[in-house]
Amino acid sequence: MLTRPEIKAYLRRIGIGEIQPPSLEFLAELHRAHVSAVSWQTVDIVAGRPVPIDLDASVRLMLENRSGYCFHLNGAFSVLLRSLGFRVYRHRAGVQPAGQEPRLSGFHLGLTVGLTDPSGQEQRYIVDAGLGDMPFEPIPLQDGTYEQGPLRYQVERSVVAEGGWRLVHDPLASFVGVDFAPEELEDIEEFKPRHEFYSRSPESPWHQLFLVRNRHAEGSHELRGCIWSRRDANGIEKIEIRSKSQWLEVLGDVFREHLTAYSRLERDELWHCVWKRHEEWKKEKMQQSNP
């Protein structure tokens, strides 16, 4: 649990001024603020400086104006919510990338929050600050379709997790869906081998992929290497970033990532690494289009 000064510091990080009693309205405010202010990212992985996913380490990332990916983001968010008096449940989950089958791989830390309704019954909500292409607000853990801005989500029973559920993402999203196991996890120990693979293995999809994402009320942003994608109700606009100054400006202004843990020299090295891979990617695309 966080101390009161830590709670206040965390809330300041995401732009919330006052502590409130647990409620659906406050939960939604916290969720919107978190996914807007704290990006999902692979920065430390690409830089070769992965951060442990222990809950204390994940909270420190937030308090130091840094970020991470699902294990860090949902881990820290779950601690904040519990410290504010919410009933939070952690779950083993698996993200289904495009072109692959649904799976319960344990490569995602899922969260639900229980709130007591006027009849005294607990109503569960899916909350997720760690999907990258995440929902903007909590989603009721009930079968149905839910629209948030230009994105549409569907909740249904999982076919790979007995007694679990599935969140189907919008057709234009970066992944197809995510399946959740119903069992509650008291700690995140079982995720540590997955984190070790994702953060250090050459086979990891994030090993050399600089990727930063966040949400806002009208859509989402993504910076994949040097390609900035802006998605809203009108579609997706892609912008190629061709200078370090513009790249750092987009990181700071759009994603609120100022690379505070990196020196000027390290930021230069990171940019050159990302730019080099971007040029290699463009060359590969050109060769594929002109065999």
Task: Give a label for each model feature.
Residues 1-65:
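Secondary-structure boundary elements
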Residues 75, 79-155:
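Hydrophobic/aromatic-rich core segments of domains that either
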Residues 1-24, 83-84, 160-291:
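N-terminal accessory/pre-domain segments preceding catalytic cores
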Residues 49-60, 151-159, 173:
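Short N-terminal helix-initiation segments at or just after the protein's N-terminus
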Residues 40-47, 64, 133, 141-143, ...:
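Generic structural "secondary-structure junction" signal
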